[in-house]
Swiss-Prot record:
InterPro entries cross-referenced by the UniProt entry: HJURP_C, MEF2-like_N, TF_MADSbox, TF_MADSbox_sf
Biased composition (Basic and acidic residues): 459-469, 480-499
Listed GO MF terms: chromatin binding; DNA-binding transcription factor activity, RNA polymerase II-specific; protein dimerization activity; RNA polymerase II cis-regulatory region sequence-specific DNA binding
Subcellular location: Nucleus
Region (Beta domain): 288-295
Region (Required for interaction with MAPKs), start-end ranges: 265-282
Biased composition range(s): Pro residues: 421-436
Domain of life: Eukaryota
Provenance organism: Gallus gallus
Gene: MEF2A
Record-given protein name: Myocyte-specific enhancer factor 2A
PANTHER family, per the entry: MADS BOX PROTEIN, MYOCYTE-SPECIFIC ENHANCER FACTOR 2
GO biological process: apoptotic process; cell differentiation; heart development; nervous system development; positive regulation of transcription by RNA polymerase II
GO cellular component: nucleus
Record note on modification: Sumoylation on Lys-402 is enhanced by PIAS1 and represses transcriptional activity. Has no effect on nuclear location nor on DNA binding. Sumoylated by SUMO1 and, to a lesser extent by SUMO2 and SUMO3. Acetylation on Lys-402 activates transcriptional activity.
Length: 499
């Protein structure tokens, strides 16, 4: 196969002409080099291109060759283009085709440099492999998918406190009140446990070794340095339950944190299970007296540990969460007037209901109107709570609740017009000797009418028709509060509200 032959005529295209000049010039110099070496001769090549640029080649020194050229009188052979064409014509080439087939494919030094560079680049690419492959080992921040765009990545301020099966958190960055649930926040709960739509609070405070979650959060926002912001939004503490108001407490699937975690889990009761059969919302039968006494015994026995709390409960208005290893039962806090319980707040907790738990569904609208000022800014703290403590609220969404100060004066006038006096301080009922003194330090607030005292109090109080108000979680005032009341005083005050 021969190479392509071109016609020897002037190239009209400027670019093609420049390329051809570069290639053939180098070819000419290459031929001169070969001739000078092979035949031991001196060669001087002088070229002016169409732009009058000088290109020269000399086998040794150009001046020496030119000096020798001027000394000669008569050249031995002198040729021009016409002579070359005539010679070619005689040889049968007719001057129409290139006599040297290799000249067209000769390369200039510049073009060869380009080609060599391209070859090196291609070799480097082929050896390295295709670029852009992602690294196999990479880290990814985990976020909880919620409908609220204000989400935070999960942070673990106390790694020994959080159960791995519940490592999820979301945050409401604004300090507004709670809104009704929009979507379901899926959490890693025990198999078989239904999930409920949470409010838009954050789920800070997942601090138990059982599958206990805080779906609404406790108004806290986990921060990586161990300090927990408590101003996100108020909400209640409870376990993950279904939309029909059911809650299940399943035993933990992860090993308990080490004993140095400071939560007093050494003497917890591992076999405590509260499994509630499914039923429709609002149709939960009350617990029997034997069940309540058994739960009381279990809670009392589970509270006999080196620390006052078996499952720490989160304070809504605590300015900052103490580091891991401290006691969470009697944290000092102050009443905060920023939050009040509105109808939107109560509707956010719809779907929380369980026997022996707090329920607003059976309270008259007038009573709910008076329960509204008792805001969630009081301390959500239980005394010696068991691992399966639950708190649920079920209410109507169309009730208008007036927003009032969190810490009302001692002499108040309710909407009926008669003064409502704070009952005098009364001593606490007799308590079992196994309870630590942390129980006696807990005060009472008007929100206690929403939930009964901790189940370790006198069980006879559960005989009244409002036995469904008994909740293991206590909404209590901080320990520095002065007015401390017994369950009987709360019942009397609830009775005075009914007209």
């Amino acid at each position: 196969m021969g190479r392509k032959k071109i016609q020897i005529t002037r190239i009209m295209d400027e670019r093609n002409r420049q390329v051809t000049f570069t290639k053939r010039k180098f070819g000419l110099m290459k031929k001169a080099y070969e001739l000078s070496v092979l035949c031991d001769c001196e060669i001087a090549l002088i070229i002016f291109n169409s732009s009058n640029k000088l290109f020269q080649y000399a086998s040794t020194d150009m001046d020496k060759v030119l000096l020798k050229y001027t000394e000669y009188n008569e050249p031995h052979e002198s040729r021009t283009n016409s002579d070359i064409v005539e010679t070619l014509r005689k040889k049968g080439l007719n001057g129409c085709e290139s006599p040297d087939a290799d000249d067209y494919f000769e390369h200039s030094p510049l073009s060869e440099d380009r080609f060599s560079k391209l070859n090196e680049d291609s070799d480097f690419i082929f050896k390295r492999g295709p670029p852009g492959l992602p690294a196999q080992n990479f880290s990814m921040s985990v976020t909880v998918p919620v409908s609220n765009p204000n989400t935070l990545t999960y942070s673990n301020p106390g790694s020994s406190l959080v159960s791995p099966s519940l490592a999820a958190s979301s945050s409401l960055t604004s300090t507004t009140m709670l809104s009704p649930p929009q979507t379901t926040l899926h959490r890693n709960v025990s198999p078989g446990a239904p999930q409920r739509p949470p409010s838009t609070g954050n789920a800070g405070g997942i601090l138990g070794t059982t599958d206990l979650t805080v779906p609404n959060g406790a108004g806290t926002s986990p921060v990586g340095n161990g300090v927990w912001n408590s101003r996100a939004s108020p909400s209640l503490l409870g376990t993950a339950g279904g939309g029909n108001g059911l809650g299940k407490v399943m035993p933990t699937k992860s090993p308990p944190p080490p004993g140095g975690g400071g939560l007093g889990m050494n003497n917890r009761k591992p076999d405590l299970r509260v499994v509630i059969p499914p039923s429709s919302k609002g149709m939960m039968p009350p617990l029997t007296e034997e069940d309540e006494l058994e739960l009381n015994t279990q809670r009392i026995s589970s509270s006999q540990s080196t620390q006052p709390l078996a499952t720490p409960v989160v304070s809504v208005t605590t300015p900052s969460f103490p580091p891991a290893g401290l006691v969470y039962s009697a944290m000092p806090t102050a009443y905060n007037t920023d939050y009040s319980l509105t109808s939107a707040d109560l509707s956010a907790f719809e779907g929380f209901n369980s026997p022996g738990m707090l329920s607003l569904g059976q309270v008259s609208p007038w009573q709910q109107h008076h329960l509204g000022p008792a805001t969630l800014s009081s301390l959500v703290s239980g005394s010696q709570l068991s691992q399966g403590s639950n708190l649920s609220i079920n209410t109507n969404q169309n009730i208008n609740i007036k927003s009032e100060p969190i810490s009302p004066p001692r002499d108040r006038v309710n909407s009926s017009g008669f003064p409502q006096q704070q009952p005098p301080q009364q001593p606490q009922p007799p308590q079992p000797p196994q309870q630590p003194p942390q129980r006696q330090e807990m005060g009472r607030s008007p929100v206690d009418s929403l939930s009964s005292s901790s189940s370790s109090y006198d069980g006879s109080d559960r005989e009244d028709p409002r036995s469904d108000f008994h909740s293991p979680v206590v909404l209590g005032r901080p320990p520095n509060s002065e007015d401390r009341e017994s369950p009987s005083v709360k019942r009397m005050r609830m009775d005075t509200w009914v007209t």
